[in-house]
Amino acid sequence: MNLQLFLLLIVVVTALAFDFTNGFHDTGNAMATSIASGALAPRVAVALSAVLNLIGAFLSTAVAATIAKGLIDANLVTLELVFAGLVGGIVWNLLTWLLGIPSSSSHALIGGIVGATIAAVGLRGVIWSGVVSKVIVPAVVAALLATLVGAVGTWLVYRTTRGVAEKRTERGFRRGQIGSASLVSLAHGTNDAQKTMGVIFLALMSYGAVSTTASVPPLWVIVSCAVAMAAGTYLGGWRIIRTLGKGLVEIKPPQGMAAESSSAAVILLSAHFGYALSTTQVATGSVLGSGVGKPGAEVRWGVAGRMVVAWLVTLPLAGLVGAFTYGLVHFIGGYPGAILGFALLWLTATAIWLRSRRAPIDHTNVNADWEGNLTAGLEAGAQPLADQRPPVPAPPAPTPPPNHRAPQFGVTTRNAP
């Protein structure tokens, strides 16, 4: 096996690993509000989302073409560069998942690839007009638009249902949430699975397996990316789901349906035009809008502020990881460089996963009350069962003998004659 084929295999495996992390990182985009409001049981929600993500991945390839051709010069791409960009995306996805921050997988991937490209060939390798017009501008506009649509939709829902019994409206909206959440999952598969298709497409162009003039990825690329994302989605990104469903706003069924409907509309529209949109930012904007639009709702602006900071630093920090990885792999070179880069990625992923086990979040505690941060109040539940022993009861007080009277202070007692 020659070095280039070896690198291609590593790139394909790493790309599918990124797709897997994208699946569990972004499950909350579709299902967080349905889980938080009780419309769907947690495990049922992620299973439904996995199936619809799988179907959605086959519906379009416009975004894949954007990733493959619209952001960097395909003629300057090497397999080392693509691998380094994927490492940047995976590491950022895992870090934000650990912290429960719903940041953009799309921007992590794009940032990693752009950073690796700059490290490899300089600024000339990046199509800056494409980055601005296809990534940055749509992200800002879509997040603001989703917030506005979510707020207006929520306000209209509560305005329309004034005077109707709350129990009746919530039951109806819970049913509606199943449909709207399904639509968001379908939209997520349509938009996000294509990004990994585009990366593998780019690697195949670099290797020479497909023409640089090709416009559609091979069928095996589409199928493998769809399956990887569906598998990741089925595991459920419980940490992200908790932040979106409980940390930002206390979601009620009418808010959940309004948020999901606005998310689906914006995501599907962007996928149709080939924009590499962040579904996370759209979903978060919609949830935030649902809090703003409901009279008297509480929005946790501190949590929202941390999310915005994460969004702002995603592109540059993922780019730094991508650039560092490219420099390391390229400096060592050959098989040792590729193997070392791959090994460091998996060691980093393992360390992050082990850290998350200190306070695990899953379907059993994802809806626990929010007590200030992601894991507050959950640490006790993370202890092994052997450590959760019930308290030992105090021994009972001794029973006094018959005819015994306890002495009273200040009273002199005499023995009977």
UniProtKB/Swiss-Prot annotation:
Pfam families: PHO4. The keyword Lipid biosynthesis does not apply. It is a multi-pass membrane protein. Keywords: Cell membrane, Membrane, Phosphate transport, Symport, Transmembrane, Transmembrane helix, Transport. Residues 379-417 are annotated as: Disordered. The chain crosses the membrane at residues 5-25, 44-64, 81-101, 108-128, 135-155, 218-238, 301-321, 327-347. One of its GO terms (biological process) is phosphate ion transmembrane transport. It is found in: Cell membrane. The keyword Magnesium does not apply. InterPro entries: Phos_transporter (IPR001204). GO terms for cellular component: plasma membrane. It catalyses: phosphate(in) + H(+)(in) = phosphate(out) + H(+)(out). Residues 390-404 have a biased composition (Pro residues). GO terms for molecular function: phosphate transmembrane transporter activity; symporter activity. Low-affinity inorganic phosphate transporter. Belongs to the inorganic phosphate transporter (PiT) (TC 2.A.20) family. Pit subfamily. This is Probable low-affinity inorganic phosphate transporter. It comes from Mycobacterium bovis (strain ATCC BAA-935 / AF2122/97).
